[in-house]
Design a protein with these regions (language model features):
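Structural motif
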Residues: 6-10, 34, 56, 222, ...
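Phosphate-coordination loops involved in phosphoryl transfer and adenosine-cofactor binding
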Residues: 70, 131-134, 207, 216
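NAD(P)-binding Rossmann-fold cofactor-contacting core
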Residues: 153-171
C-alpha cells in the first residue's frame, strides 16, 4: 500500500518523521509531495496512491479521477471544505478529518490577534485591555472550548452561541450560553468566529449581524473567509469607524480592507492557525493512525462523507 503525503504547505519535519514512523510500522510505503505548486504534479502523484494525507490542498473531482487506486483521504485538520465530498463518495473514497488536533494552536492565534487589535496594532499609542471585556465565541466546538479556556486566564466574561451544542454542555465550562447569534453579537465586545463554511453559514457574518456589536467592537476570524460577507463588512466598517476586523484568512478584498481601514484591520499573509510544530505533529500523526486503522481494520470513526 502506498500512502501519499501531498502538502503544498508542508508539515514540519518532526511531523513528517512521526507520520513515516506510523505508516512504515504498518508495512506501508510513504511518499512525499511537498511544495508542488502545479496541480499537474499532484495529478501525477496520486495515480498509484492508496491513501492520501493533505492539509489545505484541494482534492476535487479531477484529482479523484486520476487516483484510480485511492481508498481514503485524510485532511490533517478540522475543516474539510477543500475536499469534494460528493465526488469522493462517487469514487468510493472515504474522507476523514482529524478534529481537535489543531485546536489549541488556532485558539492561541485568536488571542494573539485580539491582543494586537486592542493594543492598536502596536503603534505606540495607548490601547485597552481584554480583562473584563465580554467575549463571544461563535461555535463552541474544539477550538471554541480552547478559546474559552484561555479567556478565563485573561479575566474575560465569556459567552457562546452554538446552534448544535446543548446549553448545559456550554455552561458546565463556566460559559454563558446565549440563544442566538444576534444576542451574542449585541452582547459582546469581542466575537471570535469558529463556524465552518457550509451552505447555511456562507456570507452569514453580514452587515446586520456585526452592526449589533457595541461601540469599539472587535471581530476575530480564525474560521473560514467564506462565512464573511465582505462587501457588507466593508460598508459597515466605512460607516462605523469604531469597529476592528482581524482575520487569519486573507479576504478576497484584502487590498480594499487594508487601504480603507489601516489600524483597524489585519490579515495574516496565509492561514496560520495550525502553523505550529505541535499542531503539525498532532494532526499529522492522527491522520497517519486513521489511515492505518482504516486500511487494516476498516475503522471509519472520523468519516465526513457519505458511503
Amino acid at each position: 500500500m502506498k500512502v501519499l503525503v501531498a502538502t503544498d504547505k508542508p508539515f514540519a519535519k518532526v511531523a513528517v518523521d512521526g507520520i513515516r514512523k506510523e505508516i512504515e510500522a504498518a508495512g506501508y510505503e510513504l511518499v512525499l509531495l511537498e511544495k508542488y505548486g502545479e496541480k499537474a504534479k499532484l495529478l501525477e502523484a496520486v495515480k498509484d496512491a492508496n491513501a492520501i494525507i493533505i492539509r489545505s490542498d484541494i482534492i476535487d473531482a479531477e484529482v479523484l479521477d486520476a487516483a484510480k487506486e485511492l481508498k481514503i483521504v485524510v485532511r490533517a485538520g478540522a475543516g474539510y471544505d477543500n475536499v469534494d465530498l460528493e465526488a469522493a463518495t462517487a469514487h468510493n473514497v472515504c474522507v476523514m478529518n482529524t478534529p481537535g488536533q489543531n485546536s489549541n494552536a488556532v485558539a492561541e492565534l485568536a488571542f494573539g490577534l485580539m491582543v494586537m487589535a486592542v493594543r492598536n496594532m502596536y503603534n505606540g499609542t495607548s490601547g485597552t485591555e481584554l480583562m473584563g471585556k465580554k467575549l463571544g465565541i461563535h461555535a463552541y466546538g474544539n477550538v471554541g472550548r480552547n478559546v474559552a479556556r484561555i479567556a478565563k486566564g485573561f479575566g474575560m466574561k465569556i459567552y457562546a452561541f452554538d446552534a448544535f451544542c446543548p446549553k448545559e454542555v456550554i455552561e458546565k465550562d463556566g460559559v454563558k450560553a446565549v440563544g442566538s447569534a444576534e444576542e451574542l453579537y449585541s452582547t459582546c465586545d469581542v466575537v471570535s468566529l469558529h463556524i465552518p463554511a457550509t451552505a447555511e453559514t456562507k456570507n452569514s457574518i453580514n452587515y446586520a449581524l456585526v452592526n449589533k456589536m457595541p461601540k469599539g467592537g472587535l471581530l476575530v476570524n480564525t474560521a473560514r473567509k467564506e462565512v464573511i460577507n465582505e462587501a457588507e463588512l466593508i460598508q459597515l466598517m466605512e460607516e462605523r469607524t469604531d469597529l476592528k476586523y482581524m482575520t487569519d484568512i486573507m479576504p478576497a478584498a484584502n487590498e480594499t480592507f487594508a487601504a480603507k481601514f489601516a489600524g483597524r484591520y489585519f490579515s495574516t499573509p496565509k492561514k496560520m492557525g495550525a502553523q505550529t510544530a505541535e499542531a503539525n505533529i498532532n494532526a499529522g500523526i492522527a491522520a497517519a493512525k486513521q489511515i492505518v486503522g482504516f486500511l487494516k481494520d476498516g475503522c471509519e470513526k472520523f468519516r465526513v462523507n457519505k458511503k
